[in-house]
């Protein structure tokens, strides 16, 4: 069974293994830079590590590949019989990471 970790970034949790490519909310790092991600859980075969003392020894490193944008979402507010309507759009800024190792 392969080793994987649950990492927290941008208010979300992601399941990652070494070599995975993950899109996360924008990080303030340049492409090509190495970042360390905070770990919530590590599974290594039958061993599950979730204690804070043990997780302090674990590091998940990733390389920033690029910054990109997510798909456009459209928000439309409408109130019946008053003529009120409002349109708004949003594209989330994302960072593409490649996980280089779980140590």
From Swiss-Prot:
GO biological process, one term: translation
Transmembrane regions: none
Gene Ontology cellular component list: cytoplasm; ribonucleoprotein complex; ribosome
Superkingdom: Bacteria
A single GO molecular function term of this UniProt record: structural constituent of ribosome
Cell membrane among keywords: no
The entry's keywords: Ribonucleoprotein, Ribosomal protein, RNA-binding, rRNA-binding
Family to which the UniProt record says this protein belongs: Belongs to the bacterial ribosomal protein bL21 family.
Function: This protein binds to 23S rRNA in the presence of protein L20.
Quaternary structure note: Part of the 50S ribosomal subunit. Contacts protein L20.
Protein name: Large ribosomal subunit protein bL21
Organism: Mycolicibacterium smegmatis (strain ATCC 700084 / mc(2)155) (Mycobacterium smegmatis)
Organism lineage string: Bacteria, Bacillati, Actinomycetota, Actinomycetes, Mycobacteriales
GN (gene name): rplU
């Amino acid at each position: 069974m392969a080793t994987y970790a649950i990492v927290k970034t941008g208010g979300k949790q992601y399941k990652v293994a070494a070599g995975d490519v993950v899109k996360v909310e924008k990080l303030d790092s340049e492409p090509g830079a190495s970042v360390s991600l905070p770990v919530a859980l590590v599974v290594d075969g039958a061993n599950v590590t979730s204690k804070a003392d043990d997780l302090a020894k674990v590091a998940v490193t990733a390389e920033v590949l690029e910054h990109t944008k997510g798909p456009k979402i459209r928000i439309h507010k409408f109130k019946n019989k008053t003529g009120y309507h409002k349109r708004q759009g949003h594209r989330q800024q994302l960072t593409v990471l490649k996980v280089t190792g779980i140590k």
